[in-house]
Amino acid sequence: MALLPDKEKLLRNFLRCANWEEKYLYIIELGQRLPELRDEDRSSQNSIQGCQSQVWIVMRQNAQGIIKLQGDSDAAIVKGLIAVVFILYDQMTPQDIVNFDVRPWFEKMALTQHLTPSRSQGLEAMIRAIRAKAAALS
């Protein structure tokens, strides 16, 4: 995930944005930095239910036990939200993911207050799916 900032830099960059238009543009930019998802990974088993947009998230565990996440969406802002979630879970084991609460980070970013209800529900669906997949691996 060298193309994406770490958690602290994400928060700093987000807080530097002057208004919500800039913040949305930053979220979209983060989504554009995600590596391309292979066509074969755009399957029903990787599809996230509960999102209005199409969302696919792939979870793989490397030899050191660290989770590698890949994902995509057909909506630019949602793809950016996927990138934000991936940044928060970067370099974690399955157990780390299960134990890590992303909500304080979203509160620091004031993210959930500025998303539409359907996007907030989709974001929650992504987090639930990632945590469930991680729990199955831990």
Swiss-Prot record:
GO BP of this protein: iron-sulfur cluster assembly; sulfur compound metabolic process
Localization: Cytoplasm
An annotated GO cellular component: cytoplasm
Presence of keyword Oxidoreductase: no
Pathway: Cofactor biosynthesis; iron-sulfur cluster biosynthesis
Keyword annotations of the record: Cytoplasm
InterPro entries, A to Z: Cysteine_desulfuration_SufE (IPR023939), Fe-S_metab-assoc_dom (IPR003808)
Active site location: 51 (cysteine persulfide intermediate)
Keyword Nucleotide-binding: no
Function comment: Participates in cysteine desulfuration mediated by SufS. Cysteine desulfuration mobilizes sulfur from L-cysteine to yield L-alanine and constitutes an essential step in sulfur metabolism for biosynthesis of a variety of sulfur-containing biomolecules. Functions as a sulfur acceptor for SufS, by mediating the direct transfer of the sulfur atom from the S-sulfanylcysteine of SufS, an intermediate product of cysteine desulfuration process.
Recorded family membership: Belongs to the SufE family.
The protein's assembly and partners: Homodimer. Interacts with SufS.
Protein's name according to its UniProt entry: Cysteine desulfuration protein SufE
Gene, per the UniProt record: sufE
